[in-house]
Design a protein with these regions (language model features):
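Cleaved targeting-peptide boundary
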Residues: 19-26
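Extracellular glycoside hydrolase catalytic/binding regions
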Residues: 170-172
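Positively charged n-region of N-terminal signal peptides that target proteins for export
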Residues: 1-4
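A metal-dependent hydrolase metal-coordination microenvironment
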Residues: 32-161, 168, 177, 181-182, ...
Length: 212
């Protein structure tokens, strides 16, 4: 008798579920993008709280392939605490399709991040061929004044805005990590503050030694 009652209840539940389904549209929630976050545990140092951040990212507003809010979601899923949006100033391969102010990608990312309490850093990438190469300007206020022909003037504007300036991927694109005189001059002038030793799938051992 108990088995019959149990089967009857199960049949009723299945019937009810079938009735609740919309025959026109049924949402398959299992297909939603994962909201699982990977945990990266790094201990704090003395009284300083350690945050995990990606300081070099691009979106469709320069040569990236995703919308800015997707960069925020990716960073959160990877276990980071913050992400910098650093679209190129000069290299805009999608500019015929995406026409916007150079600050727009940050605005979109910031709106998405605020909804989840995530940190987004405003930045940009000053993009030139070697010997100068590419430099990220982080913690800036406005990208537009850096859109100038002379890259040294762009760097000066970034410094004026209180930026942290990072020399990006010194070993790219020629597979040679070369410390040029222009970098020595900028470092002595206090206009380069950091060095990227790993980018995408490349590690630059010589640059690690320079940084140390």
């Amino acid at each position: 008798m108990k088995k019959i009652s149990l089967l009857l209840m199960l049949s009723c539940v299945l019937s009810l579920q079938a009735q609740l389904r919309n025959n026109d549209v049924y949402e398959v929630t299992e297909m939603e993008q994962s909201r699982v976050r990977r945990e990266i545990r790094i201990p704090n140092v003395d009284d300083y709280k350690v945050l995990k951040c990606d300081f070099h990212t691009h979106t469709v507003f320069s040569d990236g392939k995703v919308w800015p809010d997707t960069r925020v979601m990716e960073a959160w899923q990877e276990g980071l605490d913050a992400v910098a949006i650093t679209d190129h100033i000069e290299y805009l391969p999608h500019k015929e399709i995406i026409k916007a102010d150079l600050n727009e990608s940050y605005k979109i990312a910031k709106k998405a991040a605020d909804a989840s309490g995530f940190i987004v850093i405003k930045g940009t990438e000053i993009t030139r061929s070697k010997p100068l190469g590419h430099l990220n300007a982080l913690f800036i206020n406005d990208v537009m004044p850096m859109d100038v022909e002379d890259p040294l003037k762009a760097i000066d504007e970034a410094v004026r805005q209180g930026a942290f300036i990072m020399w990006n991927h010194p070993g790219w694109p020629d597979d040679k990590s070369t410390f040029y005189p222009v970098h020595e001059e900028l470092i002595k002038a206090g206009k380069i503050h950091g060095l990227e030793v790993f980018n995408h799938m490349e590690y630059y051992p010589a640059c690690f030694d320079w940084a140390m």
